[in-house]
């Protein structure tokens, strides 16, 4: 029987940070928990960052993941938004590393590709596939679904069939190794 690995996925945001916790046993994925960390929109940025760090620390303490995965920042049209997102992501990374968790990072494109099968998938498609893959009875909030999708991406890339068939870590694209 395969050992169980618990993975925490984080979708960082300065207003809402989504998280998802899954267990992976062999090729099977099991839902553990998910939720959203909401920060007060009118609070100073430093206070919002503190909320993110504190709540991610609580999630780690309660659910005891062995690995973590965080979605990378994409460059937005608005530089100020990109900077705020980067700071929220930094807070998430700091919280995870302070708990001695190994952290992997994935782009939004990689997450959508892993979960939906195409990198240009809509948020609703990601939510739908998260529900299907984890056998959920309801649809999680969008940010929580994104956190679960990040955790699933990590599981699929590191614990699933793809990792077993491709132990070198090389990417397969259009039938070729790159």
From Swiss-Prot:
Compartments where located: Cytoplasm
Active site as annotated: 11, 71, 143
Catalysed reaction, written as an equation: Endonucleolytic cleavage at a junction such as a reciprocal single-stranded crossover between two homologous DNA duplexes (Holliday junction)
Requisite cofactors: Mg(2+)
Molecular function (Gene Ontology), one example: magnesium ion binding
InterPro entries: RNaseH-like_sf, RNaseH_sf, X-over_junc_endoDNase_Mg_BS, X-over_junc_endoDNase_RuvC
Record-linked Pfam families: RuvC
Keywords linked to the UniProt accession: Cytoplasm, DNA damage, DNA recombination, DNA repair, DNA-binding, Endonuclease, Hydrolase, Magnesium, Metal-binding, Nuclease
Enzyme Commission no: 3.1.21.10
Disulphide linkage map: none
Entry note: cofactor: Binds 2 Mg(2+) ion per subunit.
GO CC aspect terms: cytoplasm; Holliday junction resolvase complex
Binding site for Mg(2+) 1: 11, 143
Family named by the database record: Belongs to the RuvC family.
Primary role: The RuvA-RuvB-RuvC complex processes Holliday junction (HJ) DNA during genetic recombination and DNA repair. Endonuclease that resolves HJ intermediates. Cleaves cruciform DNA by making single-stranded nicks across the HJ at symmetrical positions within the homologous arms, yielding a 5'-phosphate and a 3'-hydroxyl group; requires a central core of homology in the junction. The consensus cleavage sequence is 5'-(A/T)TT(C/G)-3'. Cleavage occurs on the 3'-side of the TT dinucleotide at the point of strand exchange.
HAMAP family in UniProt: RuvC
Subunit structure: Homodimer which binds Holliday junction (HJ) DNA. The HJ becomes 2-fold symmetrical on binding to RuvC with unstacked arms; it has a different conformation from HJ DNA in complex with RuvA. In the full resolvosome a probable DNA-RuvA(4)-RuvB(12)-RuvC(2) complex forms which resolves the HJ.
Protein name as catalogued: Crossover junction endodeoxyribonuclease RuvC
Organism of provenance: Neisseria meningitidis serogroup A / serotype 4A (strain DSM 15465 / Z2491)
């Amino acid at each position: 029987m395969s050992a169980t690995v618990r993975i925490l996925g984080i979708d960082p945001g300065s207003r809402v940070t989504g998280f998802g916790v899954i267990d992976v046993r062999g090729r099977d994925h099991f839902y553990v928990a998910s939720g959203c960390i909401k920060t007060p929109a009118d609070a100073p940025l430093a206070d919002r960052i503190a909320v993110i760090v504190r709540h991610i620390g609580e999630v780690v303490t309660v659910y005891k993941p062995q690995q973590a995965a965080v979605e990378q920042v994409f460059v937005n049209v608005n530089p100020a938004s990109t900077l705020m997102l980067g700071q929220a992501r930094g807070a998430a990374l700091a919280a995870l590393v302070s708990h001695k968790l190994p952290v992997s990072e994935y782009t939004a494109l990689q997450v959508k590709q892993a979960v939906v099968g195409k990198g240009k998938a809509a948020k609703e498609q990601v939510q739908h596939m998260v529900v299907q893959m984890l056998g959920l009875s309801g649809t999680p909030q969008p940010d929580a679904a994104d956190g679960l999708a990040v955790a699933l991406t990590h599981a699929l890339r590191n614990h699933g069939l793809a990792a077993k068939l491709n132990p070198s870590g090389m990417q397969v694209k259009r039938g070729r190794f790159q």
